[in-house]
Amino acid sequence: MTSPENVRRVACVGAGVIGGGWVAHFLARGYEVTAWDPAPDAEPRLRRLVEAAWPTLTRLGLAEGASTDRLTVTDTLEQAVADAEFVQESAPEKLDLKRDLLARLDAATPPGVVIASSTSGYPMTDMQTTAADPSRLVVGHPFNPPYLIPLVEVVGGERTAAAAVAWASRFYEVAGKSVITMDNEVPGFIANRLQEALWREALHMVASGEATVRDIDLSITEGPGLRWAVMGPMLTFALAGGEGGMAHMLDHFGPSLKSPWTRLAAPELDKELYDAVVAGCDEAADGRSIADLVAERDRGVVEVLRATGRLGPEEDSR
């Protein structure tokens, strides 16, 4: 098995928004990337995505030798993984599809090469059931877009080797990611669980007429989101306790956890709520296209990363 520090060739299977984002990230880090997707328009769509992401990646800092010319789109899955030293799967979130695809990847990928799934919620235990060698299958869950958001959550399944989890975690670190290595499988992992709680509350407030989509977005971007970008919710709450820290925070505000504020059960996504949320987002876009909004988001995240000192000097171990 190639060491994480010496990987040169990465295969990306699935080239949609997430898979394409991975392709862009790995290219920017100087890897040779082979990609495969069964969609007939996969290659031009993927190359457009990479081209659109490249200015942002350039601002973030490219590794030595990084080039979009290092991308090869293959005709078959088998061609994509034939010489791969790491495989990132990013197929649609359908359990049977993931299960079958991981089994195919396991059969086609050279022995010992770690295969990671970008699944946003399925436990690897449920996906590795038909693979001949489930020991090398791990979850490597990114955040959209993978070329911009540093976080990756890594966790294995019941039949995954601990060495594969450790290898994947180290590889992602070498590839410029911020890694959480989870000891236990949790449906939805960590960050999505937290996002989901906020999302449910937001939908309830829109459904009940308590807040508009604009109100909800502003409440985060102009409020706690600014603090969370620096140190996260837990440490932010600790600061709210003053010199007493989190202990004082819990003593003072802990009882309010039992207040009937939250409605953590999912709301009924009826037509009225659906239309209200869609209309609110259209209003917030104010005529800007999705491409315009993506570019605006990317510029903003780069500036947040720069302002919080997370861009650092360019590093390249390849």
Curated annotation (Swiss-Prot):
Gene Ontology cellular component annotations, sorted alphabetically: cytoplasm
Name recorded for this polypeptide: L-carnitine dehydrogenase
Keyword terms, alphabetized: Cytoplasm, NAD, Oxidoreductase
Function: Catalyzes the NAD(+)-dependent oxidation of L-carnitine to 3-dehydrocarnitine.
Cell cycle in keyword set: no
Compartmental location: Cytoplasm
GO terms (BP aspect): carnitine metabolic process; catabolic process; fatty acid metabolic process
Lineage of origin: Bacteria, Bacillati, Actinomycetota, Actinomycetes, Kitasatosporales
Similarity comment text for this entry: Belongs to the 3-hydroxyacyl-CoA dehydrogenase family. L-carnitine dehydrogenase subfamily.
Pfam families linked: 3HCDH, 3HCDH_N
Quaternary structure and interacting proteins, as annotated: Homodimer.
Keyword Oxidoreductase: yes
Pathway the protein acts in: Amine and polyamine metabolism; carnitine metabolism
Listed InterPro entries: 3-OHacyl-CoA_DH_NAD-bd (IPR006176), 3HC_DH_C (IPR006108), 6-PGluconate_DH-like_C_sf (IPR008927), 6PGD_dom2 (IPR013328), L-carnitine_dehydrogenase (IPR026578), NAD(P)-bd_dom_sf (IPR036291)
Catalytic activity: carnitine + NAD(+) = 3-dehydrocarnitine + NADH + H(+)
This enzyme's EC code(s): 1.1.1.108
